[in-house]
Each structure stands twice: as structure tokens, then as C-alpha cells.
A protein has these predicted regions:
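Compositionally biased, intrinsically disordered low-complexity regions
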Residues: 11, 58, 141-143
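Acidic, glycine-enriched catalytic cores built around paired aspartates
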Residues: 101-175
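Broad hydrophobic/π-residue packing in well-ordered secondary structure
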Residues: 1, 21-32, 39, 47, ...
Length: 175
């Protein structure tokens, strides 16, 4: 149950664990970071991974949430992820089948047929989803939730106003 809601709640946790513009470049950069919401056992393309453990070694069982950004605020990220897990236990949410396929190698149609949804591609997309989340607002509290959203919207606006060296090199000669 915990894993099931952690998977469902993972989309909300992404907003707290991947809270910077560059976080999404890592998720969608093709560097073995998860880009889709799914789970598996020994599948490194899965967002949630539950590695197999040896018989009699049940204490070594673990769940890996593979989208956590190294610069995330651990208090926010773990609060939402743990709350999602507890919510799954309370609601006795059922977990679908594990994904053994390399999700990056599947076509969009194959992923869609399997019910595998993409993670947000940008901070802006993540914020739009988070704004609709009563779950995250309840976990963080309205005050912290509002402050977080305001802060991240400001950061996104500042980012969008920047002209990067890439843009200058790519487009200036075409003027």
C-alpha cells in the first residue's frame, strides 16, 4: 500500500524534491534519471525501484525514490513522500504490475497502453500541477505551501528573462 501511494504521490513529491530549473534537465537529460511514473524491481528506468533481496535478508528490503534531486530540501521532500506512503496504507491502494521494460526504450503509445505517465518536463509544468494539489497543501500547511509556490514562481520568471549563451550563439547570427 505504501509503495502504491508513493507512486501516485510521486508526482506531488517531484514538486518538492525537484524544485529548481536544472532539476528537470537532469530528469529529461537521458542520464538514467527516471522520466516516467512507474515502478519495478531491478529496473533502473523506474521512478520507484524495489530491488530484489536474498531469501532470509528481508531487513535489507528497501524502496528507492530515484527522482530526488541532490539539492532538494529534505524536510519538504521527505514530508510529502512519507505522507503519500501513509496515505496509501490508510486507503489500502493497490499497486499495479512492476515494469520490467526499459521505459526509455518504449514508444509513447506503449507507455500510454501500460498507463505510464511522464514526469513534468519543467519547473513551470510542475508548479501548475502542484497548485492544484490539496494533498501537498495539507502536508506542508497552507502558509508554507503558499510561500513555496510564490518563491518558485518568482524563480521561474527570473529564469525566463535570461538570454543564455546558447541562444546568442544559435540565433544571433540569423538576425
Amino acid at each position: 500500500y505504501e509503495i502504491s501511494c508513493s507512486l501516485v504521490g510521486s508526482e506531488m513529491c517531484i514538486r518538492d524534491s525537484d524544485q529548481y530549473v536544472n532539476s528537470y534537465k537532469r530528469l529529461w537529460g537521458g542520464n538514467e534519471a527516471p522520466s516516467y511514473i512507474c515502478w519495478g524491481h531491478n529496473n533502473r528506468s523506474a521512478l520507484l525501484r524495489i530491488p530484489q533481496y536474498k531469501p532470509g535478508k528481508g531487513n535489507s528490503a528497501r524502496m528507492e525514490f530515484r527522482a530526488l534531486d541532490p539539492v532538494a530540501n529534505p524536510y519538504l521532500a521527505y514530508s510529502v513522500l512519507l505522507a503519500a506512503g501513509l496515505d496509501g496504507i490508510d486507503k489500502q491502494m493497490q499497486l499495479g504490475e512492476p515494469t520490467s521494460d526499459d521505459v526509455w526504450e518504449l514508444t509513447d503509445g506503449e507507455r500510454q497502453a501500460m498507463g505510464i505517465q511522464p514526469l513534468p518536463r519543467s519547473l513551470d509544468e510542475a508548479l501548475k500541477i502542484m497548485e492544484k494539489s490539496d494533498f501537498v497543501a495539507d502536508v506542508l500547511g497552507e502558509h508554507a505551501f503558499g510561500y513555496f509556490l510564490d518563491n518558485k514562481h518568482q524563480e521561474w520568471e527570473e529564469y525566463n528573462q535570461q538570454v543564455t549563451p546558447y541562444e546568442l550563439k544559435k540565433y544571433l547570427p540569423k538576425l
